[in-house]
Amino acid sequence: MVIQYKRKQEFPMVKEGMVMTEKPKRNLISSNEKRYKGIRMRKWGKWVAEIREPNKRSRIWLGSYKTAVAAARAYDTAVFYLRGPSARLNFPEEVFKDGNGGEGLGGDMSPTLIRKKAAEVGARVDAELRLENRMVENLDMNKLPEAYGL
């Protein structure tokens, strides 16, 4: 006994003259860009960060940022204050540079204070990255390195 299966149509029937187009890609992140934990990209290009409170269903909104790095650093700040030094971070080497000296570790801080600290770090990182980009844009490649103090 031979059982024959019909092949599932991969494309809907197309009338003559119709042009099939590919569906727009929802994922706007390029394949070579690293995905960070705790962040996502809005349709219009802003990056947002949020974190779930331990043992609760509620989330702490950490803000929206121009860059993925700023949103990820805001997330790192929040997760560090919520879970302590054992937390898995996007940028483990940067956490102490952000002024997270250890006060309020392990859930001692209120969600409002965590949100405030994370927003400060994210905004600072966004500002630093914007300043870096401006400096690169203003760099005159026709000048000699000595003109820049190099």
From Swiss-Prot:
Name assigned to this protein: Ethylene-responsive transcription factor RAP2-9
Compartments, record wording: Nucleus
One Pfam entry name: AP2
Similarity comment: Belongs to the AP2/ERF transcription factor family. ERF subfamily.
Keyword Transcription applies: yes
Protein's job: Probably acts as a transcriptional activator. Binds to the GCC-box pathogenesis-related promoter element. May be involved in the regulation of gene expression by stress factors and by components of stress signal transduction pathways.
Matches recorded under SUPFAM superfamilies: DNA-binding domain (SSF54171)
Alphabetic keyword roster: Activator, DNA-binding, Ethylene signaling pathway, Nucleus, Transcription, Transcription regulation
Gene Ontology BP, a term: ethylene-activated signaling pathway
DNA-binding region coordinates: 35-92
InterPro entries xrefs: AP2/ERF_dom, AP2/ERF_dom_sf, DNA-bd_dom_sf
Top-level taxonomy: Eukaryota, Viridiplantae, Streptophyta, Embryophyta, Tracheophyta
